[in-house]
């Protein structure tokens, strides 16, 4: 099932890139400073947003969600607060609440890329695969060069047994990010599961020819050779 997980992880990781340059203690120090500043200026939207961002860095999802709620109570049209409250609620597995915020955000900003990915992600987590697929189909039209969208759609298509569609999307993901071994492996694993061993081997060989280290695919190569007696 690893190749199916790549699609789901593609939806998740676009939101999960930590800020560089500070360790946990430095973030805690920043939080202490922000708490003092907020005590002096409790109506500052900027300070509340900055504090919420630090809460996220520290994994304090509930505190972050509370900060975004304070901001939205003052200005329901603040897109940063709306998006990141949806994100924090998804981290807290409050998917219905996250869905509400993503839909509000997309009503305000229909082309918000991360918002649409988040919308698809929570739909999937709620078991609404068709709705998630509808969102990703729309995103392919809106963002035809997004490798993340193709990979995410391929993962859901596999879960739904739509293997030919998934193969197409893994091919597109490879085309857009030809040096990503995970996409190659997902593509080849699906072909292997369909007993299309020669095609799977061709996908792996082409990736190695593109200078992806063969070691990434060692186990799958061995399984293919076992099936084909090579």
What is each of the regions a protein language model found here?
Residues 24-33, 59-70, 92-104, 126-138, ...:
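Structural signature of tandem alpha-helical TPR/SEL1-like repeats
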Residues 25-28, 190-193, 198-230:
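Terminal, low-structured helical/coil segments at or just beyond the last alpha-helical repeat
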Residues 45-46, 79-80, 113-114, 147-148, ...:
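Helix-start (N-cap) detector for alpha-helical repeat units in TPR-like alpha-solenoids
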């Amino acid at each position: 099932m690893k190749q199916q997980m790549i699609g789901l992880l593609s939806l998740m990781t676009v939101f999960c890139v930590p800020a560089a340059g500070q360790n946990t203690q430095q973030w805690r120090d920043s939080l202490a400073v922000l708490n003092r500043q907020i005590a002096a200026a409790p109506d500052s939207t900027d300070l509340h947003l900055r504090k919420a961002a630090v809460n996220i860095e520290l994994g304090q999802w509930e505190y972050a969600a509370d900060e975004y709620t304070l901001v939205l109570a003052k200005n329901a049209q603040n897109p940063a607060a709306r998006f990141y409250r949806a994100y924090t609620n998804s981290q807290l597995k409050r998917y219905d609440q996250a869905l509400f915020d993503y839909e509000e955000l997309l009503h305000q900003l229909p082309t918000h890329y991360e918002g649409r990915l988040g919308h698809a992600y929570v739909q999937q987590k709620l078991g609404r695969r068709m709705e998630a697929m509808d969102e990703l189909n729309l995103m392919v039209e809106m963002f035809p060069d997004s490798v993340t969208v193709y990979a995410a759609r391929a993962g859901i298509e596999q879960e739904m047994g739509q293997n030919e569609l998934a193969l197409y999307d893994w091919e597109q993901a490879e085309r857009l990010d030809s040096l990503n071994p995970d996409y190659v492996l997902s593509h080849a694993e699906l072909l292997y599961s369909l007993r299309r061993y020669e095609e799977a081997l061709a996908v792996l060989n082409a990736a190695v020819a593109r200078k992806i280290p063969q070691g990434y695919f060692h186990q799958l190569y061995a399984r293919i050779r076992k099936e084909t007696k090579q």
